[in-house]
Design a protein with these regions (language model features):
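Short, structurally constrained coil/turn elements
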Residues: 10, 62-66, 129
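Surface-exposed amphipathic alpha-helical segments
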Residues: 14, 113-136
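Conserved polar/disulfide-associated segments of primarily extracytoplasmic proteins
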Residues: 19-112, 116-124
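Generic hydrophobic secondary-structure signal
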Residues: 6-8, 78, 113, 129-130
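Short non-domain terminal segments
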Residues: 4-6, 88, 101, 131
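N-terminal "mature-domain start" segment
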Residues: 1-19
Length: 136
C-alpha cells in the first residue's frame, strides 16, 4: 500500500481505506494504518531524549481518550530509524483491545504506525506493518 510519502504491506484480504494523510487496512476488529504529520521543526537524532518525553505524554493522552492505559513503552528500530512504540490497552464494545502505536520521526515528518488487535490474540499484521514500512 502507498500513501503520501510512505508504503507498507498488510494482509491482502483486508479492506483498504484512504482518508487525508492516513492509509488503513482492516479485517474484523483488527486494523493497521499509517498516518503522517508535518513537524514544525525538523527532527534530529540529538533531540531523541526530548522526543521520547513528548511522545510519552502523547501516548498517555491517547490512552486516556480511549479510557485505557499505556501498558508498555519501548524504543524499537523501524528500518534504519529509531522509533518509539507504545501498547495501549482499552475496552471497546465489551472487547479487550490493544492499540500498538509506533512513532517514526524523520526530518519534518512524523509517521504514526498503528496496529489494533484483540488482547491475548496473535498480532502478525503488526509485525508485517513494522517490517514492511518504508518512508519515501
Amino acid at each position: 500500500m502507498h500513501g503520501d510519502g510512505f508504503s507498507f504491506a498488510a494482509p491482502g484480504s483486508w479492506t483498504v481505506t484512504r482518508t487525508g494523510t492516513t492509509v488503513a487496512a482492516s479485517h474484523g476488529g483488527d486494523t493497521v494504518s499509517v498516518t503522517t504529520f508535518r513537524l514544525t521543526k525538523p527532527y534530529r537524532a540529538q533531540l531523541w531524549k526530548q522526543a521520547v518525553t513528548e511522545l510519552d505524554q502523547v501516548a498517555a493522552k491517547l490512552a486516556a481518550e480511549l479510557k485505557g492505559t499505556v501498558v508498555a513503552s519501548r524504543t524499537v528500530k523501524v528500518g534504519s530509524s529509531t522509533a518509539r512504540q507504545y501498547d495501549l490497552a482499552f475496552t471497546k464494545d465489551g472487547e479487550q483491545l490493544v492499540e500498538r502505536i509506533t512513532f517514526v520521526l524523520l526530518g519534518r515528518r512524523e509517521y504514526e504506525l498503528l496496529c489494533r488487535y484483540e488482547a491475548g490474540k496473535d498480532e502478525p499484521a503488526c509485525s508485517q506493518l513494522l517490517a514492511s514500512f518504508r518512508p519515501a
